[in-house]
Structure formats: C-alpha cells, structure tokens
Amino acid sequence: MTSKSCLLLVAMVTLTTSVMGTAEVMSHVTAHFGKALEECREESGLSAEVLEEFQHFWREDFEVVHRELGCAIICMSNKFSLLQDDSRMHHVNMHDYVKSFPNGHVLSEKLVELIHNCEKKYDTMTDDCDRVVKVAACFKVDAKAAGIAPEVTMIEAVMEKY
C-alpha cells in the first residue's frame, strides 16, 4: 500500500468514525428530548395523530409542517431551558445539554451552528410556533446533509435509557 493510499484510508476511517459518532450522540439527544413530548402534547394542541407522527421526526417521509409541532418543540425546549425568552435557542444551555450525553462534545458545536443558521433564515417571522417549526424543518434537512442525523433504529436502541 502506498503512503497516499494509506493516508486516504486513515482520512476515510476518521471521517466515518466522526460522522457515526455524531449520529450516535444525536440519537441520545433525540431520545431524551422526545421524553418531554407527552407532557407538552396538551399544552401545544398536538393531535394524537401528529403526536404519533412526531415520534418519527428523522424519517424521510415525515414532514415538519404543522404549527402545533413548533408549539410542542417550544414547550419541550423550555423543559430543558434550551430557549431564551424570545423562543430562540439559548446557545450556552444547548451546548451544555448536548455535552451532557456520552460523547456530546463531538456534536454540540455542529448542532448549535446548524440550529443558529436556520434561526437566522426565519428570524423575521413573528409567530413563535410557526417560526420554530420552520427552523426544525430546516435543521432536519441540514442535519441530514451534515451526516449527523440519527437512524430511527439508533434512536429506538437508546430509548430505554431515558
């Protein structure tokens, strides 16, 4: 094996391990965050059907479009002190929350960056629930593109821990 081939192999293994690590951490974050969903169902006006669908947030066919989802995400985020008073992400608290999971440090910077970039896109929207559902949809697309979105099976595997 030439030195160039060896370097390429090391780079590919490192990148794959990094992406797999962040997706695994994201599965923990998703499972833990999702535990607040039932508590927030009534407060946000989430129907039983949308509640059931929301359990599959990361699936390709799940569309993040319902205003009530935005309201539920606000409620859930407030349970963990992840938002400021204006319903925008509290960067320090979000970093700390993500870092509280095993290997969370490998994900926190990227997750906060992606959410912040999505928040900037919809900053002029005045309805918090509408804005947050748009931010969530944007984040889902960007997280998948960045390779940090977890597989549904990964989330199911860690659900019992939370």
Curated annotation (Swiss-Prot):
Disulfide bonds join C40-C75, C71-C129, C118-C138. Antenna. SUPFAM superfamilies: Insect pheromone/odorant-binding proteins (SSF47565). Transmembrane segments: none annotated. It holds the Pfam family PBP_GOBP. Keywords: Disulfide bond, Olfaction, Sensory transduction, Signal, Transport. It comes from the Eukaryota. One of its GO terms (biological process) is sensory perception of smell. One of its GO terms (molecular function) is odorant binding. CDD domains: PBP_GOBP (cd23992). The keyword Magnesium does not apply. Residues 1-18 form the signal peptide. Present in the aqueous fluid surrounding olfactory sensory dendrites and are thought to aid in the capture and transport of hydrophobic odorants into and through this fluid. Belongs to the PBP/GOBP family. This is General odorant-binding protein 2. It comes from Heliothis virescens.
